[in-house]
């Protein structure tokens, strides 16, 4: 089974990279021998880099795949000690942030006996009973159990929670200067500033498995950049997240939120305008949802020219604001999952769950 997955990946990648059949067959022969001897095989650095890029290209839920080939891949498979691990994490955050001109990065640790990360994203805000991000309550409880104490605000940056092989779970509090944040304001509605809203610049996903040719990398944090609606519609407005619709509408001085007033819709539009222009004011990369959809159209055309079918999950590719203005709303997608790819960890796995409460 493993060899078949390896074979499919190697043949696909090597052909895309224009390798001759003789070289492909030699590599497959070596992999087959390695699997027979050890039960697994090791990717070359080139395979790791290209495989990670292919995983982004194959990510059905991602609207930003046009830039898959620009992914910066850090091979951290040799990282085993704490100092090197923490250094690699801060390096990733620094390079990805790039003083606001965000760059897509992935740091890939060893498939076995590597470090574990318990955070959903490398940077996220704590969730308390009465404030903060409800989506992060479990991670916040774990951080508290380990001895971390937040300030109890809506936007306390959670520490990195990690575990090295044969060691206990620990937390690392980021230096304030490492985390770039954007205060949210609206140039036409100054009252919005009184809500003290802000959001971090770089979304670095750290709770997914990277699978390349049958090899699973359970710790491989990766980032692109935000599409505005991820913050302005989902994070701030969803009732199971910050649930700020009423407060935002009040800041915009909308006197009613009756459905037939359309003020709920207006509040969403104005908040997304505020998020987008706040990021731009701070010099931080972000894309609006309509531009992102246009970029995805270009990605589809590029893939068609290469003879590759684009797979996708429609409910994720249609943005949550004015989706009918985008072309991807108006046709379906084949949701077949290709390899390489990113996968959510199985619920029975405790790889990124609280080791004290699972």
Swiss-Prot record:
Cross-referenced InterPro entries: Nitric_oxide_synthase_Oase-su, NOS, NOS_dom_1, NOS_dom_2, NOS_dom_3, NOS_N, NOS_N_sf
Domain of life: Bacteria
Residues that hold heme according to the record: 62
Pfam families reported for this sequence: NO_synthase
GO biological-process terms attached to the record: nitric oxide biosynthetic process
Catalytic activity: 3 reduced [flavodoxin] + 2 L-arginine + 4 O2 = 3 oxidized [flavodoxin] + 2 L-citrulline + 2 nitric oxide + 4 H2O + 5 H(+)
Keyword terms of this UniProt record: Heme, Iron, Metal-binding, Oxidoreductase
UniProt-listed Enzyme Commission number(s): 1.14.14.47
Assembly and interaction partners: Homodimer.
Stated role: Catalyzes the production of nitric oxide.
Other notes: This protein is similar to the oxygenase domain of eukaryotic nitric oxide synthases but lacks the reductase domain which, in eukaryotes, is responsible for transfer of electrons to the ferric heme during nitric oxide synthesis.
Protein name: Nitric oxide synthase oxygenase
